Structures are given as C-alpha cells and as structure tokens.
Amino acid sequence: MKYEDINENTIKITLSFDDLTDYDIKLSDFFGNQEVIEQFFYELVDELGLENRFGNVGMLTFQIQPFPQGVHMIVHEEAMLGEGGEIPDDPEEFEELMTGFYNKLNEIGADMARERGITDFKPGLGLPGTKKDEAEQEPDFIYYSIRYEDIMSVLTGIKNVKFADEESEFYRYDGNFYLVVLDNQKEKGKMHVESTRSRMMEYGEATKMSREFLQEYGECLIATRALDVLRKI
C-alpha cells in the first residue's frame, strides 16, 4: 500500500489485491457493501494519519478506481462550508448542506456503477430509512468527553467554537482537564452534533473517560453550565 499527493486537497492511495486481502476486503465490496467500505476507509484514514494531512475544513470522501493489480482510492477533502466560509450552526442549514453533499456522493457512486456494468446499484447515502435500525436506536441526548492538557487549550477551544449545549461539566483528573458535554441529537441531528464535537477536538483530544468515571474519580471543578462559566473567564 502506498499513497501520493495529487493536490493540496486530494491524495491517491494505491492498494494491491494482496493489500485488500490483508484487510479482508473484496473488490465487489466497493460496489455493494457500504458499511464494510466505510469502515475500511476510516481505518485507512486513521492508519495513514490523513485527518492531519488535510486542513480540517471539510469531510474526507473517496472514489474507487480499479486497475489490473488492485484499486486506487482517491481521497478528497470535500468542503462543507456555508456562506461566509464556515459550517452553519443552524440545524436546518446544516441539514440542507449535508443533503447536497450526499446527493453528490450518490451521483458519483451511480456513475461508477454504470461504468462497470452494475445494474442493481441503489444510492442510499443520506436518504430517509438508510440504516433504519441504527437510527431508531440513536439516543435523543448524548454525553461526550474531551481531554485537554492545559486550561488555555480549554478556554481557546470553547471561545472559538460557538454552540448551545444542554449541559456541561468540567473536571480535573491525573493532571489533565476534561470537558463533559450533553448535546441534543434529536433537535440538532447526529451529524451536526458530531461536527461540533470534531471542531472542539481541534483544541483537545477524544477520550474514553466516561462521565461516570470522572464523577467518581475526578475532581469536579464546575458542576453545571461549565461552558457558560468558562466563556466568561
């Protein structure tokens, strides 16, 4: 497996059939097994450190180009910017932006299927009912935690990323600071919440420390409305 830069927003990953075998991926999976390929894609993104390679201003998308010895995966940073060059905070505007983004991906998938004679391709990204069983199990509210090495990283992050949370708490544990946020997936949509979380993590790091663990073993510095309190500092 190797990759090369195409331009500042695009790279090409070359995977041989032996590489695909190592990941237990078949060529047919690229055209009929969306969940497996999405998981494979994110494994490559993590393994190659591609999130750090790009400018973190959009979503990473990919396109598959088979060749005799394997496949080329063209990875592109797809801009997700609204008017003024920022991701919209309004849930309806964000949903509209994502609808256009998914439509574009579905068009690319349909073109690829047509070129390869695949007649049963069913565009499903972003459509109502996609992964219905998973959607039905999604909680209305979700807690997530972000770890920071120092207080300045916390203050910089929360002042640069503006959003309305349901509740937030602030802890210290083992020399690090932890911000625990409760957000409303039902009202904002899962993708909007994930986008906010990703922007917050530009100033900190994802952590597996649960709220329950921090409540029991951490030092609670701000028990309620932590974001509001910290923004006033």
Swiss-Prot record:
It comes from the Bacteria. GO terms for molecular function: protein-macromolecule adaptor activity. InterPro entries: MecA_C_sf, Neg-reg_MecA. Gene3D superfamilies: 3.30.70.1950. HAMAP family: MecA. Enables the recognition and targeting of unfolded and aggregated proteins to the ClpC protease or to other proteins involved in proteolysis. The N-terminal domain probably binds unfolded/aggregated proteins; the C-terminal domain interacts with ClpC. Homodimer. Belongs to the MecA family. This is Adapter protein MecA. The gene is mecA.
